[in-house]
C-alpha cells in the first residue's frame, strides 16, 4: 500500500524432519541409540566429505544384504530379465500409477515386465524408453541387458538402447523398482510412458506384469545420508 505496488509472497515449506535433526551433538551424545552415530561424527572430525564416504560404504553393504533377500536375484544375479515371466506369481498392473492405488500395500522391490514389439524400421536404430517417474529408485533392463538406473522419486526416466541391440520383433522391458517407504511405483501421466525411434512413438502405458522381490519389513535399517535433513544435528545450526 505504501509503494502502490502489488507484492506476491510465496511460502514454500517442507516438513517431516525428525526431532534429532534439530538437536545438538552434545545433547544426542547422552541419548541412547545415538551414541554410535555421534562417535562416528567425532571420528570424522565433523567433516562432511568423510561422513559421505562412510555413508557410501555403509550403503553398499546394506544393498548387498538387501539384494541377497530379493526373490528376483539368484546367486547375486538378476534372474527375471532375459525373458517374459509367465508364472502364476506374476500379476497384472495398469501403469503408470503408485502401486498402493492398485491394491499393493508394499514397501520394497517390485519387478515389472512388459513385452513390446519393435517395428522393422526401428532395427539398427537407437531406441529411447521413456518411463515417467519411479518412486524411489530403479534399475531397468531390455532383453537381459541393463540400460539404466536412477535414484530419486521425482526424476523422469529416459533410457536408450544402442542401435546394435535394436532388433525387429518382440522384446522384454524389465524394471526393478525400489521403494523405501511411503508411496511407490512407476507414476506420472500415461503420455509420459512410451518408446521412441525413427520419428515414431509407441505407448508403454497400460498393463504390465509384476512380482514382488523383497519387503522392507524385517530388513535392517537403511543408512542415513549426511546430506539429508534426516541426519542427526543437520538442522541444529539453523535454530
Label the model's feature ranges.
Residues 2-3:
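A short, Lys/Arg-enriched amphipathic alpha-helix followed by its capping loop at the start of a domain
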Residues 7-11, 130:
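Structural recognition of the beta-strand scaffold that forms the well-ordered cores
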Residues 10-17, 21-98, 167-239:
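An acidic-aromatic loop/edge-strand motif
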Residues 102-104:
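Outer-membrane beta-barrel proteins
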Residues 133, 141-192:
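Beta-strand-rich ligand-recognition modules
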